[in-house]
């Protein structure tokens, strides 16, 4: 609800943050956050909320819940990363732009897709860019 607007204000401090919401996809999460921000009052338009979200959020990691049944009938619930999108400033009509970094694959972990240039700094923290590109290229074959 309206606490999403407060979340943006906290994120704008630039000290880093992590937040959760429930949605069917990463794009749906962004749409939901826009709607939640608008619940803060008439002063928050969808355009303002979308623009501020595009500046405040770097990544959306969507987690799915898989239900499986073993051959002996034992049921298991397992969470897996379904997709990761990079969020950036977008066109005037939407306010933010989404770039799919890891895309959904049915019954499998998300597959590497595209690494935006601004995320290359992750290499300084142990992210293997060469492996990412090799896997992304292999997934497209």
Where are these regions (language model features)?
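Flexible loop residues that form catalytic
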Residues: 65
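NTP-binding/hydrolysis catalytic cores, primarily Walker-type P-loop NTPases
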Residues: 72-141
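Conserved P-loop NTPase nucleotide-binding/switch module
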Residues: 1-62, 71-77, 82-86
């Amino acid at each position: 609800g309206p606490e999403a607007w407060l979340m943006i204000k906290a994120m704008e401090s630039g000290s880093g943050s992590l937040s959760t919401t429930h949605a069917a996809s990463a794009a749906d999460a962004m749409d939901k956050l826009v709607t939640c921000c608008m619940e803060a009052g008439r002063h928050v338009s969808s355009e303002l909320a979308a623009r501020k979200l595009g500046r405040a959020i770097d990544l959306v990691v969507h987690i799915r819940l898989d239900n499986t049944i073993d051959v002996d009938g034992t049921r298991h619930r397992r969470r897996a990363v379904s997709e990761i999108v990079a969020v950036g400033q977008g066109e005037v009509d939407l306010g933010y732009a989404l770039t799919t970094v890891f895309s959904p694959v049915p019954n499998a972990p998300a597959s590497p897709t595209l690494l935006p240039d601004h995320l290359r700094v992750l290499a300084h923290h142990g992210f293997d860019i060469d492996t990412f590109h090799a896997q992304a290229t292999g997934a497209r074959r």
